Each structure stands twice: as structure tokens, then as C-alpha cells.
């Protein structure tokens, strides 16, 4: 009797999700995974292979099950590392512990070339923006930021002034699910730059525009139980009236194109994202 109950329950479960799968409209994009989902395959030699991908992508309540998996892994089994993404205090971190010396040298060579070619007798400043791993207290592999800073400081042209920004930021300055910093947290950074560069102080934008949900680049790589972020972009009359020229698309655009909030990466709201 017990085996029959288990068998019937399993069959009922499969039938229920088959019916739900037929009734639900297919999704084109997963914003949580930041990718296009498989569509129903055409009838050809690859039909059954593509059908497997389609059924997996269009499974009912897929996002909810991913969230349950993330909760089970992170909370129940205490697994903080997955696909090189580390979870701590509701933040996701991309672990990267190696400094690419060749890349640093290449950067320094480019800076020296630009300095010698285009910036003669100009005031030049350099800042290294730390990623949010710098503010991660846990003992996990991460960049030797002191060594990286030393490599840059000791090899930059002597006429370039270094502006240290590390103490103007904190972990709270970054998104939970993404590598980027939050625009609304950057006033201390702006004030430091203005002070060191002898620029006139300006009013920091105060009009907050919010968009939710924002699933960052790191969220797409792991099944996480962490809640989505809220993107906040700041405006004032000057920003609203300003335009920018997109050299890649060869067109004039507003500072914020709200249509980009509906992109797979909503962070594209900031100067058209990677296109700019």
C-alpha cells in the first residue's frame, strides 16, 4: 500500500507539472540568470536534444526552485562557495586571488604613452578603485591589494598624482548581487576627487529613481537565496537636460535611457552599459 501511494504521488506530481508547463506561457529571457531561454524546438534531427534544454528552461516555477536550491546549499549545508562565487552576509563575491603582472605592465605602458603623447604639461591624476572583495573580512583567497597598489604607485610617471579612494568606500557601497558600486554611495568619492584636484564643490544629485528587481552578474552564476538588488540612479536638472554622444552607436543619447532597465543587465541604464 505504501509503495502504491508513493507511485501514485510521483505520477500525480509529474502530471501536475506537465499540465502547468502546457498552461504557462514560455519565457524568452531569464533575468535572474541573465540569458535567453530555450524555445520549443523545430522538428529535425536535433529535436530531442533541444527538447531536453527547452523542458529544463521552461520548467514551471524554475526561479523558485533555484532559490530553494540556493537556500538549501547556503543556509542548510553551509556551502558558501559555488562556481567561484562566495556568499557572505547576503553579498556575493567573485573570488580572484591572482594579480596578472603582464596586465599591470600593459596598463602602465599605455598610461605612459598617453602621458607622453597627449598630456604634456597637464595636471594628471590616478585612482585605483577597489572591488568589493577589498572590504570582505573573511579569510578567503583574494587579491594582494597592497602589492597591486605598490606596483602601480612605484611605476607610474612621476608627474601623476595618486588619489587614494579606499577609505571613501565600504562594503555597503556595492551591490549585493553584482560587482559594481552604487551611484548613491559615491558622494565621499566625489568630494575626495574635487578636493585633491582643486575643483569647485558641486551639489551631489539628490533625486533618487529606483528600479527593482536587479539581478547582478554574480547572481546569474549561482543558485542563490539572496534577494534582488534595487538600482538607484540619481538625477537633478543639469543631468536631466544633459546629453551624451555614443561613439559606438554614433548617436546622441540622454544620460539615462530608461528602456535599458528592461535589458538582461539593468545596469545598462548607466551610459548605455557596455555599449558605451
Regions found by a protein language model. Give the residues of each.
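Extracellular glycan-modifying ectodomains
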Residues: 1-276
Amino acid at each position: 500500500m505504501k509503495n502504491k501511494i508513493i507511485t501514485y504521488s510521483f505520477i500525480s506530481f509529474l502530471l501536475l507539472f506537465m499540465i502547468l508547463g502546457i498552461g504557462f506561457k514560455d519565457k524568452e529571457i531569464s533575468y535572474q540568470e541573465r540569458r535567453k531561454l530555450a524555445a520549443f524546438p523545430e522538428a529535425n534531427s536535433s529535436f530531442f536534444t533541444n527538447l531536453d534544454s527547452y523542458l529544463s528552461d521552461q520548467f514551471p516555477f524554475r526561479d523558485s526552485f533555484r532559490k530553494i536550491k540556493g537556500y538549501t546549499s547556503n543556509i542548510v549545508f553551509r556551502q558558501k562557495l559555488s562556481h567561484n562565487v562566495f556568499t557572505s552576509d547576503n553579498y556575493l563575491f567573485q573570488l580572484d586571488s591572482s594579480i596578472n603582472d603582464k596586465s599591470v605592465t600593459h596598463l602602465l605602458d599605455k598610461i605612459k604613452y598617453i602621458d607622453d603623447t597627449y598630456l604634456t604639461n597637464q595636471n594628471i591624476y590616478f585612482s585605483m578603485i577597489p572591488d568589493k572583495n577589498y572590504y570582505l573580512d573573511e579569510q578567503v583567497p583574494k587579491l594582494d591589494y597592497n602589492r597591486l597598489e605598490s606596483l602601480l604607485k612605484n611605476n607610474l610617471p612621476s608627474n601623476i598624482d595618486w588619489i587614494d579612494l579606499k577609505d571613501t568606500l565600504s562594503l555597503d557601497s556595492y551591490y549585493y548581487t553584482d560587482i559594481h558600486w552604487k551611484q548613491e554611495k559615491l558622494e565621499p568619492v566625489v568630494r575626495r576627487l574635487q578636493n585633491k584636484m582643486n575643483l569647485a564643490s558641486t551639489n551631489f544629485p539628490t533625486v533618487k529613481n529606483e528600479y527593482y528587481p536587479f539581478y547582478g552578474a554574480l547572481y546569474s552564476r549561482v543558485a542563490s537565496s539572496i534577494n534582488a538588488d534595487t538600482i538607484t540612479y540619481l538625477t537633478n536638472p543639469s543631468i536631466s537636460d544633459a546629453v551624451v554622444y555614443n561613439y559606438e552607436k554614433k548617436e546622441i543619447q540622454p544620460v539615462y535611457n530608461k528602456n535599458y532597465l528592461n535589458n538582461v543587465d539593468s545596469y545598462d541604464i548607466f551610459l548605455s552599459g557596455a555599449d558605451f
